[in-house]
Amino acid sequence: MKTLLGKIQVPDNVFSGIRGRSYSDNARLHLGKSKRNLYKIDLTSFFPSISRETVYRFFFEALCCSPDVAELLTNLTTVDLKKLNQSNLLEVYDFLANKGVKCYNHLISGAPTSQILSYLVNHKMFDELQSLSDKNNVTMTVYVDDVIFSSEHKISSEFRQSVLSLIKKYNYQVSRKKVKGYSKTYPKLVTGVIINSEGKATIKNALRKKIMVEYEYLQNNPADIKSRQRLRGLITAARQIDKSAGHSQILCKVQWVQE
């Protein structure tokens, strides 16, 4: 089903489970020759807040599926907590209640179809956010529950409030702790990528440290195949962020593991 959903055309600034698009591509849209102000928000408990009814309406109305087909597809992509026989179900209820989520029949967290569906079933909300951004000369990207806005100009408090009001209109909540604004010269963290004070993507220090720790371990345990694979994966992740990272001192030290 993910393959079929992936055939639906979505805007170029959407990176929610889209084949060929990654978290680093999402951050890259906020780079540029000039430094940019940035404003980012996180939708609280996004998947559990996407109700079965919302998913059903998408299949029935947007994709014009028959009622029985829409019902089947909804059953495959949502979960009803009340039908699950779990010993810790009360703990789950309490957790969701503390997050302000009142929906117990919702999009499945972790399912391969959920990321793309989280955008598709809410495309009207994201379209409105995009329209608002266009009117204010703001660049917007969507990576699942992370919505990022950037501009060469100041991002006004009026714009920020309009964003929050629009999201509230669609019955979603924003994690206040994860709402952040950055000035042009301040380093920014965007979906795991650091945008430095010069407006360029750089590798997080935590990733550099992981590479060095794994490299040192592999030097002492050269026959450890899993360590070799982990190191290769870390290098690949670093190069997704900064393609020139392969020439840095850190990554040159581990170049041999890719031979």
Predicted features along the sequence, with ranges:
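Right-hand nucleic-acid polymerase module
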Residues: T3-E71, N75-A111, Y119-S133, K154-E259
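Short beta-strand->loop micro-motif that forms the acidic, two-metal-ion catalytic signature
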Residues: D145-S151
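Conserved, non-catalytic sequence blocks in retroelement Pol enzymes and Pol-derived host proteins
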Residues: S114
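Short beta-strand
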Residues: T139-Y143
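Short acidic donor-binding/metal-coordinating loop in glycosyltransferase active sites
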Residues: L43, V144-D145
